[in-house]
Amino acid sequence: MNNKYLLTTALAYTNGPLHLGHARSTYIPADIIKRYLKLKGNDVIHVGGTDNHGVPITLTAEKEGVKPEDIVNKYHNEIKRDLDNLSVEFDSYGKTHSDTHIQNAQEFYKKLKENGYIYEKEIEQFYCPDCDKFLADRYVEGSCPFCEGEARGDHCEVCGRHLEPTELVNPYCVICNATPQLKKTTHYFFKLSALSDNLDNYVKNSNMPDHIKNMAYSWIRELHDWDISRGIKWGVPIPDDENQVMYVWLEAPIGYISFTKMMGDIWKEYWLKNNDNNTENQNTKIWHFIGKDITVHHAVFWPGMLLGHGEYNLPNSIFSGGYLTLEGKKMSTSKKWVVWVDDFIKYFDSDYLRYFLMANAPLNRDCDFSFDEFQKRINTELIAIIANFTHRALVFSHRKFGALPVIDKPEEELNKEDLALLDKCSETIEKYNKNMMDCNLKDALVDIIHLAKEGNNYFQKMEPWTVDDENRLKQIMFVCGVITKHIAYLLYPFMPNKTNELLDLMNEEMDLEIRGNELKKPIVVFSKIENDTIKMVKEKLLKSENSKNTKNKKKNTKKNKNGEKMELIGIDDFAKIELKVAQILEAEEVPKSKKLLKLIVDIGDEKRQVVAGIKGHYTPEELIGKKIVLVCNLKPAKLCGVESQGMVLAAGDEEVALLSPEKDLPVGSTIC
């Protein structure tokens, strides 16, 4: 029996349109998986929408002199336009600022309270005497206590640290610039700590990827109750308290349920537990697609809410997309170093973007968008390999037969080489299916490319243009037709528009069967991206940041992520660093440390003890045998009383990944 799948995408925040990073991490992957699951005959719905509440909306509205609703409606429409242009399809798409959602969120809150998970607590919060109101974190700005840069009450853009408003130096109210005062007030809290054992069991039995499980475990070990109310007017009102609204991270995920309810009673089949024994519905799979910056919210807080409510199915898996940089630099909307979806699709087919963003790197890893790399990958992979084969096969079949030839009994009529290639098609389907179910989208595309390469090699070897035997020619082009049909079928979830054009030329349906229908005259479906186009688009879309870079070209200093000036070094200084491939032999936790693991590593000629701040991202057990990159000539240092004889290289902020050699190099290999 086929499963029911409910796919959700993180609710886009209505303070701006979509950029390429949003498309890559969340929306395109979800649409690809939805199309794939439907191809396999599953019952699938895709639910999404926009997140409309919170302080950033009110701040923007106040600055522009409009109502919050005006900001919400403007960007809700722009975001939906962008998603439509990316061919991202939804079965239900809503807004959190709607009667349906507000009512549903309040009912959810009441159920949590009824079950004993909501309580009141007195806290201290900044209060502006001039504005006569308590200030939510975004209404307070000041200097960062760590880097002295300008910072908001929740975050420093300069050094990237998470902040509490009370940590700011010289804080001020962003509305009137007055100095706020700390004043006692009452907030509502969700008793998340009471659910730690339930959450631990949930994560253990879920199908989440290991890196997400590890992150969830690190939070569950030290769970605190959660402040879920804010003293502002814009949001979902707390029932029976007109002075406070729900914190957006309490009410926004409930939108997944609200927007499914918009489809009618069918929502119950996806969300509600079995009526007879109140157990999870095993035939329903809920998969969340999100950006990695909100992984903890979906892996810990949201399941905690569902557990506290008690009547809903829990998510089966979470797929978190990594960050996307632009031309090697972090995207920044404030610095205008960003490419908006709406601008991009004015110049390039959205299917090309879908292909590139998924082919560029595994979904959970950070990657870079470079216009030159975009052009190169499209031209050398999609055009030179995939399109080259399919176009040649269709042109030749059209000229010789007017259709894709059909052979009724391939196992009797084809030779061993032909049959081996048909077996290759079956093997490709098998590998592709596994990669798609695991959301390994890059690997799934590699499967397609390998099949197209096999087709090109076969076509060249058979040289059908030299074959006089019509029966043999029919056999050759039948094999080419089977491969072409497989490529179109497998590529469809990634490039729905282009593959539909291809199938239209073939006069075929979206499956793996060849019917021998009359071919339309082949035309070029996949067009090469020219150098002049890339040059023109880069000048238009990267202009503001390039101008800024030109002004700063002569500077020989940069800033690190803490905002501190960083002197550039020469190659001689860099050459002093000794980097080697090491292998982890033993790993254990450092007592009384929240972040440190003690490792024993082999660097070829000796074993070293190293301390690394990767606890919570890796368990000791999964590190054994892993090859890493080690700085070997660093002076020994003590961390939490444990000596470290080197430094393990890793990357990432919220989600940390160890650096390892791309190929399986021998232990002790020098990295240069």
UniProtKB/Swiss-Prot annotation:
Gene Ontology CC: aminoacyl-tRNA synthetase multienzyme complex; cytosol
Subcellular location, principal: cytoplasm
Gene Ontology MF terms: ATP binding; metal ion binding; methionine-tRNA ligase activity; tRNA binding
EC number annotated for this UniProt entry: 6.1.1.10
Disulphide bond pairs: none
Motif position, 'HIGH' region: 12-22
UniProt cofactor note: Binds 1 zinc ion per subunit.
Keywords of this entry: Aminoacyl-tRNA synthetase, ATP-binding, Cytoplasm, Ligase, Metal-binding, Nucleotide-binding, Protein biosynthesis, RNA-binding, tRNA-binding, Zinc
Top-level lineage group: Archaea
Cited Gene3D superfamilies: HUPs, Isoleucyl-tRNA Synthetase, Domain 1, Methionyl-tRNA synthetase, Zn-domain, Nucleic acid-binding proteins
Family according to the record: Belongs to the class-I aminoacyl-tRNA synthetase family. MetG type 1 subfamily.
Subunit structure: Homodimer.
Protein name as it appears in the record: Methionine--tRNA ligase
Gene: metG
